[in-house]
Amino acid sequence: IESLDLCLDFLKNDDIDSLIKISAFHYLFGYIHPFYDGNGRTSRFISSYLIKNELDVLLALKLSYTVKNNINKYYKAFDVCNDRKNKGDITFFVVTFLELLSQSSDDLYTKIADLNDQLNYYNNIINTLVNEKVLNDKQAKCIFILCQNRLFDDTYMNMNTLTELLEKSDTTTRKILKSLESKNLLVKSRNKNQYLYSANLDSLSSQNFTKCFD
């Protein structure tokens, strides 16, 4: 318990860079944790929480994924620093942890940039359909929301959420959804007592899309 208290005091030291503190704390907590579970889940959870507060929640989540995919490198860093011949020097672990964090940041940036490019692609298609009078503004807003949800969350959206985001009545939202469904722009599924909606990205990106409305 005293060692854990010292670790927490270490985190409060403003003279040390925050990311270095988090990296060192991750090792120290895993080393002294009296209920250590053998795979560092607790340490990674705490570190992700600290990174969320210091940087970004998406990066914190991505770090857990990166560690999982580089688990041998992660464990090796522990082994090197745990070796008595290392004489308590945890630099190797701190550097390794920061490398994993940097990799997480790079991967996340690449992923978001790619998704943003895709969103711009579909948004351009939607704007073209508006200009060609295929879609009105309300339909365009609805399908753009569904595109964002499909790309960034990869889930279906219920009508109540759509109604709130569109700032329309239930009746108006139903009409919008029905019109988009008739244009083959929606993918609809049923979950218990409600329908769920997603954008039909294949239909949007089809080269022959506008022919469907001739």
Positions of PLM-derived features:
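Hydrophobic, well-ordered secondary-structure elements that form the walls
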Residues: 97, 162, 173
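Short, cationic-aromatic polyanion-contact patches
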Residues: 188-213
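Short helix-to-turn junction characteristic of helix-turn-helix DNA-binding domains
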Residues: 146-150
